[in-house]
UniProtKB/Swiss-Prot annotation:
Role, per record: Catalyzes the attachment of proline to tRNA(Pro) in a two-step reaction: proline is first activated by ATP to form Pro-AMP and then transferred to the acceptor end of tRNA(Pro). As ProRS can inadvertently accommodate and process non-cognate amino acids such as alanine and cysteine, to avoid such errors it has two additional distinct editing activities against alanine. One activity is designated as 'pretransfer' editing and involves the tRNA(Pro)-independent hydrolysis of activated Ala-AMP.
NCBIfam families cross-referenced by the UniProt entry: PRK09194.1 (NF006625), proS_fam_II (TIGR00409)
Record gene name: proS
InterPro entries xrefs: aa-tRNA-synt_IIb, aa-tRNA-synth_II, aa-tRNA-synth_II/BPL/LPL, Anticodon-bd, Anticodon-bd_dom_sf, Pro-tRNA-ligase_IIa, Pro-tRNA-synth_IIa_bac-type, Pro-tRNA-Synthase_IIa_type1
Protein name: Proline--tRNA ligase
Pfam families named in the record: HGTP_anticodon (PF03129), tRNA-synt_2b (PF00587), tRNA_edit (PF04073)
Subunit (UniProt): Homodimer.
GO cellular component, one term: cytosol
Subcellular location: Cytoplasm
UniProt organism field: Shewanella woodyi (strain ATCC 51908 / MS32)
């Protein structure tokens, strides 16, 4: 491809509204352009990368025995009503009506549609197991789209769905999808980690996420230093306390704390150890009888909202109560709330259950209680795992300790069980002629998100550093002063032809542009290999080669350049 015939829309300046490096570089490299909040057009450079990732995903799905189909982005709302997700999914589900006042949704996922297809097309055990996939645009009306294509409202996704009559074939397909995802990320040239995960709004039992490792990742991954255990922090089980509750040594006392609105301020101003404090958080309950619920964790711990949501009394989706409701129920505002005397249900973390002589809000503004003890000052509350695991704690697998790293989720696989098939009456006849409800699996890859994740992991201060497999072009040709030197022009044209004939994707910068601009653009868009041609190179009979990732430069004889670039890493 000649740059003169190409849309190379690079920018020198970093856009002010781009928060993360992938968003900045995708805009600067001319890969995408914003049309509206969370909506982007893919320009040629970005689309070439997107299509390469899509091709690798498709190849690995085909190898794993999945069969490609294509489902509509617009879905009948009736299917979502069947599964109960029309209301449960929340405002991320874009609902609308057609001219006949029929309800539709813009698909954020396709469980309902695929289950509807299978219940109509599959009626015998002889047609199972069945694994179907598509690569299709999705839409989720994110409350705050951000980070470019990392969290956009419209995105490209590969979603696969498998159907089974028995757990054995379900497990086999799940394992094949796990391996396919590992193969995809390996072929893309990305460092990644599969982790045990929560099933979220899709539901189901077993679940794994696939994370591209990057310091900018939104997700925290907890992994064992002594085994292959790894889990999303939302799912990682915190260790049970090993100590027993100590004896009470203090009387409970009410203390004025006018300047202590946070745990940190309470610790600093009143000399209490943070391990002897608790945070009491008021959240929405799941019933009319208990519209508010109190959750209590140790002052140095962080609430895990995913774990908390699994308590039956807690509203799903998880939501904190607003201050007006808190004051009406408790008589005080956030920062002064504690478990003593609360008239709403109280649930505590396991770590809180073994605390003694601890401090908490007094349910009066600007006051705290010190020297609180269970069963003396308040009844023992029901305990759950409500917190995030902490680096250095014992791993849930029993081997090693926990370390934390950041990742970007690009894939998620689930064993859904019968969640959707039961709701939609998806049954087939087994070998005995008896109707059986189908088991389902679900397997998603964020194709467009992978582009951003790859950049987050592969860049420097000059631009993107693409892995070879997904680079928009493998080689860039930079002819110096081509428009003033016929020798350089002829040599560049011949090299362009030779590389193209050899099946190597080339971007030939034939612009009448300064060398500095040409070099900057090639580094910005991240081509793995660059060949420089100048009069001095021609005199010496060599091309100047530069490797984008290593910065290595070397001279390559004219007659060796094609084979050299074929094997260059």
């Amino acid at each position: 491809m000649r740059v003169s015939k190409y849309l190379l829309s690079t920018q020198k300046e970093t856009p002010a509204d781009a928060e993360v490096i992938s968003h900045q570089l995708m805009l600067r490299a001319g890969m995408i352009r914003r049309n509206a909040s969370g909506l982007y057009s893919w320009l040629p450079t970005g689309l070439r990368v997107l299509r390469k990732i899509e091709a690798i995903v498709r190849e690995e799905m085909n190898k794993a025995g999945s069969v490609e189909i294509l489902m509509p982005m617009v879905q009948p709302a009736d299917l979502w009503v069947e599964t109960g997700r029309f209301e449960k999914f929340g405002p991320e589900l874009l609902r609308f009506q057609d001219r006949h006042n029929r309800d539709f949704v813009l698909g954020p996922t396709h469980e309902e549609v695929i289950t509807d297809i299978v219940r109509k097309e599959v009626n015998s055990y002889k047609q199972l197991p069945l694994n179907l996939f598509q690569i299709q645009t999705k839409f989720r009306d994110e409350v705050r789209p951000r980070f470019g294509v990392m969290r956009s409202r419209e995105f490209l996704m590969k979603d696969a769905y498998s159907f089974h009559l028995d757990q054995e074939t379900m497990d086999e397909t799940y394992e094949s999808m796990f391996q396919a995802y590992s193969n995809i990320l390996t072929r893309l040239g990305l460092a990644f980690r599969p982790v045990i995960a929560d099933t979220g709004s899709i539901g189901g039992s077993m679940s794994h996420e696939f994370h591209v490792l990057a310091n900018s990742g939104e997700d925290l991954i907890a992994y064992s230093t002594g085994s292959d255990y790894a889990a999303n922090i939302e799912k990682a089980e915190s260790p049970m306390p090993t100590q027993t509750r100590g004896e009470a040594t203090q009387e409970m006392s009410l203390v004025d704390t006018p300047n202590a609105k946070t745990i940190a301020e309470l610790v600093e101003q009143h000399g209490v150890a943070i391990e002897k404090t608790v945070k009491t958080l008021i959240v929405k309950g799941s019933s009319e009888e208990a519209p508010l619920v109190a959750l209590v964790i140790r002052g140095d711990h962080d609430l895990n909202e995913v774990k908390a949501e699994k308590i039956p009394a807690v509203h799903a989706p998880f939501e904190f109560a607003d201050e007006a409701d808190i004051r009406k129920a408790v008589g005080a505002g956030p920062g002064s709330i504690g478990p003593v005397g609360l008239e709403i249900p109280v649930y505590i973390d396991h770590g809180v259950s073994v605390m003694s002589d601890f401090a908490a809000g007094a349910n009066q503004d600007n006051k705290h209680l010190f020297g609180i003890n269970w069963e003396r000052n308040l009844p023992q509350a029901e305990a759950f795992d409500l917190r995030n695991i902490i680096e250095g704690e014992a791993s849930p697998c029993g081997q090693g300790t926990i370390a934390l790293l950041r990742g970007i989720e690009v894939g998620h696989i689930f064993q859904l069980g019968k969640n959707y098939s039961e709701a939609m009456n998806a049954n087939v006849l087994d070998q005995n002629g008896k109707a059986q409800t189908l088991l389902m699996g679900c397997y998603g890859v964020g194709v467009s998100r992978m582009v951003a994740a790859a950049i987050e992991q592969n860049h420097d201060d000059r631009g993107i550093i693409w892995p070879d497999a997904i680079a928009p072009f493998r080689v860039g040709i930079l002819p110096m002063n081509m428009h003033k030197s016929h020798r350089v022009q002829d040599m560049a044209e011949q090299l362009y032809k030779d590389l193209s004939d050899a099946g190597i994707e080339v971007l030939f910068d034939d612009r009448k542009e300064r060398a500095g601009v040409m070099f900057a653009d090639m580094e910005l868009i991240g081509l793995p290999h660059v060949v420089v041609i100048g009069d001095r190179n021609i005199d010496a009979g060599v091309f100047e080669y530069k490797n984008r990732r290593t910065g290595e430069k070397q001279e390559v004889p004219f007659d060796q350049i094609v084979e050299f670039l074929k094997s260059a890493q």
